[in-house]
Amino acid sequence: MPKRHHHTESRLNNLSVNADPEHPVYREATTEIQKRLRYMVDKHSQVFVGHLEFRFPPEMETQNNNRHISNAIRKCRMKLKREGIDAQLVWAREQRNSDQPHYHCYPICDGNKVQHVQRVAGFFNEIWSREIDASPESNYVRYCPPQEQADSNTGIRIRRHGSDAETQLHNASHWMSYAAKVNEKEKTPEGCRMFGFTQIPKA
């Protein structure tokens, strides 16, 4: 994603985003997030969106690349596929004052197969723990429920034929656009990606 333009309005591509003049988001990243959200909503009668945070052990020295998260996301996608769960994954790297980055990941899942994010978080925590050589009990992956519009307080569910489908679509776009915020990416090393997205299958 070579071009990065700031977006400061509360809507983009006819969907709600969490942005204003003091809290811009990257337009290109937000658009990629929305593409994956719309793809899943068009494909499945129900879509469940969760939010996971990946961190490193405080004593671990991290490199100026995204090798660990890239490996983990690839393995997480494979795990979900083996479990029969269709999903698109979005991740963002953040690093402001800390010596270590942390990552936000939004799994956009077939809501007929995923009822709450804890199951997905468990898969991801096991994979991340192996990737960073940590104990799964350390829980360096945790889920972050939305403040509002939560389904069982763990994520956002969009039911295609539900009376609140359009509202929940906007809620999900607004929630996920947090990953595209400009703030807290100041220490991203030059040449290091800030975002990652699983590929949408070609029609």
Predicted regions and their residues:
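Histidine-centered divalent-metal-coordination microenvironment in nucleic-acid enzymes
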Residues: 90-113
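A general alpha-helical scaffold signature found inside nucleotide-binding enzyme cores
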Residues: 71, 106, 119-123
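Catalytic "initiation/cleavage/transfer" segments centered on a nucleophilic residue
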Residues: 1-46, 62, 111-203
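Residue-level signal for well-ordered alpha-helical segments
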Residues: 29-31, 82, 105
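Glycine- and acidic-residue-rich phosphate-binding/metal-coordinating active-site segment common to enzymes
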Residues: 85, 94-98, 121-125
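Signature for HUH/AEP ssDNA processing cores
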Residues: 35-95
